[in-house]
Amino acid sequence: MFTTAIAGSLPKPAWLAETEKLWPQWTTQGPELQQAKADATLLWIKAQEDAGLDVIGDGEQARQHFVHGFVEQVEGIDFVNKVTMGIRNNRYDAQVPQVIAPLRLKGRVHAFEAQLARAHTKKKLKFTLPGPMTIVDTVADRFYGDKVKMAMAFAELLNQEALALQADGVDIIQFDEPAFNVYMDEAADWGVKALEVAARGLTCITAVHICYGYGIEANNKWKETLGHEWRQYEKVFPALAKSSIQQVSLECMHSHVPMEMMKLLEGCLLYTSPSPRDCS
């Protein structure tokens, strides 16, 4: 039998953050914000347990954005002077921070929510992190001058946090990589390698979630161009099957990925998410 779990993020209540916005703002600040994040996390843990899920997540209630929630705790990134950049192969424009110096973690990134979740559930705990390829597609490079080099730098930082999360008692660490459904050649060439750097040394279960993005017009129009069969994974799946990543989560409800392509993932335990994930 397959264990049951959410893909990752869950809606934030209106008393925590703005609703139905791509880049929502927090509705409070300071100690009140920290308490609101904790309250929302605990409410969703209870909801998941009440639903009978086998694996529990924090619902990403303490993060404004699935990428920025990590990179905000990285030195060498300028969030003040954001620039407009096309992301996901120029599918749409976004205001993104700039990498301007060597990348280093300021300290722990997700200790608060991981330890909170671990203390409030006896079930298996999953925690999500953005994948290195998706991070470099969501920030502007003004320092490294090489996308792969910057991805590997982020992968090292992700690895530091992933090992710390494992020490916090996390059972499954999932890396979110929507870039894997956009840059097929690059994902097979170096994206999976960067992912393995991020997962290096982990003894807990490792997973990658390949999501199709927010339900915004730009994403919906892009999906319409993919035809009646989405075979773009023929390049990426074999690379993932050969990797050390143990699980693949793929959003299938609104996709047209032929089921026979799952054979290309032999060696991985495949999960198919029932609905689009809240990531771009």
Q: At which residue positions do the language-model features occur?
A:
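Active-site loop segments of alpha/beta catalytic cores
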Residues: 112-115, 119-129, 134-270
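A gly/proline- and charged-residue-enriched helix-loop-helix capping module
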Residues: 88-107
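Short coil/turn segments at secondary-structure boundaries
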Residues: 32-35, 83, 101-108
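Active-site-proximal glycine-rich helix-loop-beta segment
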Residues: 52, 169, 275
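N-terminal basic, low-complexity leaders that serve as flexible interaction/assembly modules and, when applicable
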Residues: 1-76, 112-127, 147-153, 192-203
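Single conserved hydrophobic/aromatic residue that forms the stacking wall/gate
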Residues: 271-280
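Glycine- and acidic
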Residues: 23-30, 100, 141-144, 177-180
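A charged helix-plus-loop insertion that forms the helical arch/lid used to bind
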Residues: 77-78, 82-85
